[in-house]
Amino acid sequence: MFLLILLSFQDRVYVPNSNKLPSWELGLELFRDNVAWSQKYPIHRNLYGTLLTQIQIEREGAVISRSAVKSCIDMLFNLSYPMPHVAFSQRPSLYLQEFEPAFLHTSVEFYRAEAEHMLERGDAAQYLRHVERRFLEEEERV
């Protein structure tokens, strides 16, 4: 509790005049640089690959821990992309800058292949029902 009071005081008194980041934002940057986006241990690459794999296997019908995937994606939204000369609040998130392009690419590839396979069967009504089901699944995933 004492640490919270001390950091709150520091954020109110010291930070505005020093051109430094508030404690929370500084903590996020330190976590990003030293853990999640470490140059020594490429955790972020493993994380992106694992998230994409989990989403892929869920699309294929397996049950995954959606709460774990959501927690990781929320973390990527909260971590800003490192841009030293841009204000913290103006920086895009790691999700938008790095993960989303890979996610969209794999989604396009998956649904393109699935659509080609479904259309080869030639049943338009079944294809439309399948597309509607996929829309609902993706909406639930969000």
Give each language-model segment a name:
Residues 1-142:
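Eukaryotic scaffold/interaction segments
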